[in-house]
């Protein structure tokens, strides 16, 4: 059993400098400094979406996630990279100029991908880490391949550390992926009901009541055509959004007026989200079988 004071030795923990092979998903729209801080202090890699203040460096390694449809100028990426250990990109083809902007700030650069070809492109662009996202993931889904098929192919295709992402909600699942060669796992859905997360109460309650079969992949939430692509959400939110005509990609925050008619992102691991827990406790649970 991995205790918070122990280090699990993987290429990820050695490179990033954290104790546990876990990365918090940036959770755009609801991710907070407090959530990332709890994960960093607990031994993982805490992440915030671009625009949210990263946690203090003394708490542990942290990172900033950038979405390609809304990526800022290179100089802004470089400045952000100077404040964190990792910058990560998602929802776009790997771009060596963006990778260079992250490196210029002194950060490691990660790219979340949905296919082996995209993983190879990320490594060729100079990325230090590749996140292999299985189709089980919540939120925007880049590929169509289940994680158990994608991971062995990705590990064989690239030489940089590979993180597994998508549908990871149990300690046993995390341990199995690490044992099978993953350098770390990336988790998002399990943290959505944490008190440190900016999730609307109604959204959190819907997550707690949901099972694995209650998620669907849809292209409806495309931000009015600005961000096309598939996303995994709670099925009930899709029905309500279609009735209201809402197409916003923004997940329901505590300030949302009609939270359950918005993009209620959830991965297939939602079935393992059964109660509200502090982020540090979630991380300990996930690491308990390592």
Predicted stretch roles:
Residues 2, 137-140, 144-163, 169-290:
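Conserved active-site-proximal phosphate/metal-binding subdomains
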Residues 1-161:
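Active-site entrance/lid segments in N-terminal catalytic domains of soluble metabolic enzymes
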Residues 112, 166-167:
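Conserved acidic functional residues
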């Amino acid at each position: 059993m991995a205790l918070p004071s122990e280090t699990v030795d993987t290429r990820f923990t050695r490179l990033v400098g954290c104790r546990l092979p876990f990365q918090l998903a940036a959770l755009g729209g609801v991710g907070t400094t407090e959530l990332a801080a709890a994960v960093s202090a607990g031994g993982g890699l805490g992440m915030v979406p671009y625009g949210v203040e990263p946690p203090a460096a003394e708490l542990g390694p942290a990172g900033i996630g950038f979405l390609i449809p809304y990526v800022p100028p290179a100089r802004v990426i470089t400045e952000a990279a100077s404040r964190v250990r990792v910058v990560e990109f998602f929802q776009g083809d790997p771009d060596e100029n963006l990778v260079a902007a992250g490196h210029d700030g002194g950060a490691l650069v990660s790219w979340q991908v949905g296919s082996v070809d995209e993983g190879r492109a990320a490594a060729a662009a100079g990325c230090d880490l590749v996140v292999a996202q299985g189709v089980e993931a919540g939120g925007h889904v880049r590929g169509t391949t289940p994680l158990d098929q994608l991971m062995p192919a990705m590990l064989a295709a690239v030489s940089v550390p590979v993180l597994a992402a998508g549908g990871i909600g149990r300690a046993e699942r995390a341990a199995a992926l690490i044992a099978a060669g993953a350098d770390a796992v990336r988790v998002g859905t399990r943290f959505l009901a944490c008190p440190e997360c900016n999730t609307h109460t109604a959204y959190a309650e819907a997550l707690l009541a949901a099972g694995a079969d209650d998620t669907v992949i849809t292209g409806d939430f495309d931000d009015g055509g600005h961000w096309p692509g598939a996303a995994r959400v709670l099925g009930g939110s899709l029905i309500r959004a279609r009735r209201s005509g809402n197409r916003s990609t923004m997940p329901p925050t505590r300030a949302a007026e009609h939270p359950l008619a918005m993009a209620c992102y959830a991965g297939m691991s939602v079935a393992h989200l059964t109660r509200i827990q502090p982020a540090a406790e979630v991380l300990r649970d996930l690491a308990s079988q390592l």
